[in-house]
Amino acid sequence: MFSPDDVKKYRDELGIKEHNDSTIKKDFFDFLEERDYSLSYKMPFMLAFINNINTIGDAEIDKVLDEYIKFYQDRIDRGLQVDRRTCPYNEKMLKDKKAICKNMLANPFEKFERKRFLYYSKDLSIISMNHALFSQMTKEDWKRIRTQMQEDLRNYYSEMGGV
């Protein structure tokens, strides 16, 4: 293994930022600001998650999943394009909660999990926000996330019939 001095040396040489509990909030908002949307999944997922998060940073996966599905089903019900052509979501698939849950956990959830912002407990059926991140969040931060996700959805769907 590397000594702490070696880690710092290589981190400096390679330009690798340190990621820890003191940087997690900035890391999270930097990640959101990247606006990396090959498909729309991150936006309705994050909105569903923050709409269902409780006072300790947990959200029941079934509630998140129901709201996530509702977003796409609403688009179908209104005769709007669900997403880009590569998106597998259609009327039939949206009725298969198990398939949608598997897809949601693979993408977009996994993108948040890989960076340690969110965790999933299959046994508890809970998606949790990293507690260091959750403890630093303010009302303004939640509003900022909601506003950005709604704006990003409007921009994303601007050429697909709107949100």
Listing of model-derived features with the role each one plays in the protein:
Residues 1-163:
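Intrinsically disordered, charged low-complexity linkers and terminal tails
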